[in-house]
Amino acid sequence: PAFTAENTANDPDAAKAVYVADVVLDKPGPWNVVALVRDNKGEYSAARVAGVKAYADDPVPDKGDKAPRVHTPTLDDVPDVSEIDTRVPPSTMHDEDLADVLGKKPVVLLFATPALCQTRVCGPVVDVAEQVKRDMPGPAYIHMEIYEDNIPDPKKLRDQVRAYKLPTEPWLFVIDCKGVIDTRIEGAFSVSELTAAVERAQKGC
């Protein structure tokens, strides 16, 4: 993306590109994932990537659900942006409080911790969100960190993360102007995916 944080640029394990495939998981439980890739010479290679788990009863708010109304910290709430953002440089998505804008305008709510991410894609997806924010400035864009005091401890999840019952990171919620979740994505996403999600959320506003 056009916006690449130092976290992403300096992390050799960070995702440098996102490839999208829509797959239907027709029963709950763990699934193994194998990626088959054809290179520019027409040659194929395969690699096993991180598995996924499908839930019979998913606790995370989904498409069509009302988004939980929680306060998200803004620049006005802290003396230093580093308290609410581990990205270098900090993201520009700390101007609006979800509790104030929910149901009034579309919202792009991104839970991610660029410096502390276990999946190595938090930094890249924040970069993607920054690019879409520049190109589509209408919605409220909110970046929410995962851990209290930015200490990577599963016992110190921020209240907002607990309210959304998130088991992993990153998570993206694109919410329409009625406060209803229109798109939910766990993990990595592309500029085109987020752009399409914002376009859908803006319809009818």
PLM ranges: what are they?
Residues 1-26, 30-81:
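Contiguous segments within soluble domain cores/interaction surfaces
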Residues 59-63, 73-78, 182-205:
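Thiol-/selenol-based redox modules, centered on thioredoxin-like
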Residues 81-98:
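A Trp-anchored, charged/polar loop motif used as the substrate-binding/catalytic surface
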Residues 98-118:
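Short active-site neighborhood of thiol/selenol oxidoreductases, capturing the structured segment around
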Residues 104-108, 136-141, 169-170, 177:
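Loop/turn elements at helix/coil->beta-strand transitions in domains of secreted/extracellular proteins
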Residues 112-119, 146, 183-184:
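Second-shell loop/turn segments in exported
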Residues 119-135:
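Typically the conserved alpha-helix immediately C-terminal to a functionally engaged Cys/Sec
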Residues 143-169, 173-181, 191, 199-202:
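Thioredoxin-like thiol-disulfide oxidoreductase module
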